[in-house]
């Protein structure tokens, strides 16, 4: 019973079936948005108009289709596929390698009929033939008048390395799904923050108590006044508030600390600081008018003490100025930092408040995954090494010689013909 179960797990058809199931689940995870809020699913998958007649937000949440790659059943399929690979390696690949290492002598000349490449030699001595074979880097084993030769045995290890690398990748994926997390924070510059806004996390995840600070944030622009790159000066602090690590990050250049990555992902303008005629500094919030494309923020600043008249302020960049419009919507000028504008009452632009969007994530399985892919590439190179075998039987004045190879048949035929020439 035990042997039959293990052989069933090691069967190639079973492994392919599990792989197809995993691929189908991955397609579902690609089509359905992952790790979104319930409101998003209620909006896109309503109960009244079910997709395909059955798919709605309640079904998605019930079966965990909103986080497919972290569900117990998806991780179970991955574990089952890994178990199938491991069983196949133990029951099939290692025995095949063990057989390949043995001296597989041909005892009778009739066995040469099973080979596609064989010859009967009468004009070449055995010592000459063995010298040529040895010169071609073959290992030679001889018992009286029978000889067995092979080379490229390392090529037979490639399938084992493939299985090993895939098992490493699967273990890394499971470990990362169970212990990793992803968070998104929008932090005003000069502010310190903890990791709080968790977007997704695994069942065994422990959120690190890391204190960080955004020291500064700025944007560089192209000649066409479009955003070229945005930067955040980020510090990692210890429990006493002292700086441990500091780095200026930008898109695709994160700061790393204790296997936690801080990525630059977004930015926002949140307010204006204005000094009025009484030298008081007031802060006005900015509202974003667009969700995509060109970003524009707007606020309203009163120009009299009764709040009946005012100025509309527009900000569309972080180049240190804002645009001013009067009550009729007529453009009256730009106001730069530390510049004073006078319309009914003087106002001075003190600062444009910005915030940076940071994605904070950790994936403890990434090292295993990278190592697995490294071995996978190594196995690809090793698989190009041809495993070739040559058998020889000497009877009276005749020499029977034949050969076989796992790949590169044409090259082996040329080599074989040169050996017996």
From Swiss-Prot:
Topology of the protein relative to the lipid bilayer: Multi-pass membrane protein
Spans through the membrane: 12-32, 71-91, 157-177
GO cellular component terms, semicolon-separated: chloroplast thylakoid membrane
Broad class of the protein's primary localization: plastid
Organism: Trieres chinensis (Marine centric diatom)
Annotated signal sequence range: none
GO biological process: cytochrome complex assembly
Protein location: Plastid, Chloroplast thylakoid membrane
Family designation: Belongs to the Ccs1/CcsB family.
Name of protein: Cytochrome c biogenesis protein Ccs1
Superkingdom as given in the UniProt entry: Eukaryota
Keywords from the UniProt entry: Chloroplast, Cytochrome c-type biogenesis, Membrane, Plastid, Thylakoid, Transmembrane, Transmembrane helix
Quaternary structure, from the entry: May interact with CcsA.
């Amino acid at each position: 019973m035990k042997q039959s179960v293990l052989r069933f797990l090691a069967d190639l058809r079973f492994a392919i079936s599990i792989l197809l199931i995993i691929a189908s689940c991955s397609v579902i995870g690609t089509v359905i948005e992952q790790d979104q809020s319930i409101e998003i699913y209620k909006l896109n998958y309503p109960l009244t108009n079910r997709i395909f007649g059955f798919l709605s937000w309640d079904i998605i949440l019930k079966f965990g289709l909103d986080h497919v790659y972290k569900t117990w059943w998806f991780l179970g399929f991955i574990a089952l596929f890994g178990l199938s690979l491991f069983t196949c390696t133990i029951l099939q690949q290692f025995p095949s390698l063990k057989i390949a290492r043995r001296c597989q002598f041909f005892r009778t000349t009739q066995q040469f009929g099973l080979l596609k490449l064989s010859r009967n030699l009468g004009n070449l001595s055995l010592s000459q033939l063995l010298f040529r074979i040895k010169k071609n880097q073959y290992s030679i084993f001889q018992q009286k008048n029978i000889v067995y030769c092979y080379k490229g045995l390392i090529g037979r290890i490639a399938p084992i390395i493939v299985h090993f690398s895939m098992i490493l990748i699967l273990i890394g994926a499971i470990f990362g799904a169970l212990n990793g997390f992803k968070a998104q924070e929008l932090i005003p510059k000069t502010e310190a923050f903890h990791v709080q806004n968790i977007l997704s996390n695994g069942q065994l995840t422990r959120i690190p108590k890391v204190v960080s600070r955004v020291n500064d944030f700025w944007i560089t622009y192209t000649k066409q006044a479009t955003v070229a790159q945005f930067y955040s000066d980020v510090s990692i602090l210890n429990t006493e508030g002292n700086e441990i690590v500091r780095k200026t990050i930008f898109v695709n250049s994160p700061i790393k600390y204790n296997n936690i990555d801080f990525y630059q992902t977004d930015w926002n303008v949140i307010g204006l600081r204005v000094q009025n005629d009484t030298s008081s500094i007031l802060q006005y919030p900015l509202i974003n008018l667009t969700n995509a494309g060109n970003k524009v923020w707007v606020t309203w600043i009163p120009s009299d003490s009764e709040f009946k008249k005012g100025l509309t302020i527009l900000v569309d960049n972080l180049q240190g100025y804002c645009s001013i419009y009067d009550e009729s919507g007529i453009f009256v000028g730009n106001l730069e930092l530390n510049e004073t504008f006078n319309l009914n009452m003087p106002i001075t632009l003190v600062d444009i408040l910005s915030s940076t969007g940071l994605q904070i994530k950790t994936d403890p399985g990434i090292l295993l995954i990278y190592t697995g892919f490294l071995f996978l590439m190594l196995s690809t190179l090793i698989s190009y090494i041809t495993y070739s075998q040559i058998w020889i039987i000497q009877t009276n004045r005749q020499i029977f010689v034949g050969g076989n190879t796992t790949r590169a048949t044409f090259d082996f035929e040329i080599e074989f013909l040169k050996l017996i020439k």
